[in-house]
């Protein structure tokens, strides 16, 4: 028999991983939520390149959030009402890395 707490944590923490490789001064959207109210999630960016990138997150009825992730750095933020997630390469070299989205991350500790 499965542990109910483990099942709850699995449901809350189904992560989605996107890999990016962007030319200099180029951006791309990686996630679009079809629910108009958006998604509550933890968004993590792992910048595995020597170029800084900008994380852009649009949200329902909230201002757009922008964060700079320096070369070789990691950044995570938990927000509500997420509609889109994108990355823009601010550097002069190819930028590559990963975007990890963990829906309903805050519920993990409530299970």
Q: What is the role of each PLM region?
A:
Residues 28-32:
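Short, charged beta-strand/loop "edge" motif centered at a coil->beta-strand transition
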Residues 36-40:
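Extended extracellular/luminal ectodomain segments enriched in beta-structured repeat modules
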Residues 25-27, 70-74, 82:
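Tight coil/turn sites that cap or link beta-strands
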Residues 78-94:
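Noncatalytic modules at the cell exterior or secretory-pathway interfaces
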Residues 33, 43-49, 87-91:
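Asparagine-centered strand-capping/turn motif at beta-strand->loop junctions
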Residues 42-64:
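Short, surface-exposed beta-strand/strand-loop-strand elements in extracellular ectodomains
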Residues 13-18, 52, 61-69:
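Surface-exposed loop/edge segments in extracytoplasmic proteins
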Residues 2-19, 23-26, 92-111:
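C-terminal interaction-tip segments
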């Amino acid at each position: 028999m499965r542990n109910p707490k483990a099942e709850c944590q699995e449901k809350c923490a189904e992560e989605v991983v996107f890999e990016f490789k962007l030319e200099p001064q180029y951006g791309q959207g990686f996630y679009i939520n079809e629910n108009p109210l958006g998604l509550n999630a933890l968004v993590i960016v792992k910048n595995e390149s020597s170029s800084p990138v900008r994380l852009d997150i649009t949200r329902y009825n909230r201002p757009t959030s922008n964060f700079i992730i320096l070369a070789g750095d990691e950044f995570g933020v938990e927000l509500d009402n997420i509609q889109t997630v994108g990355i823009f390469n601010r550097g002069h070299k190819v930028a590559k890395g990963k975007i990890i989205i963990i829906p309903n991350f805050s519920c993990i500790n409530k299970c």
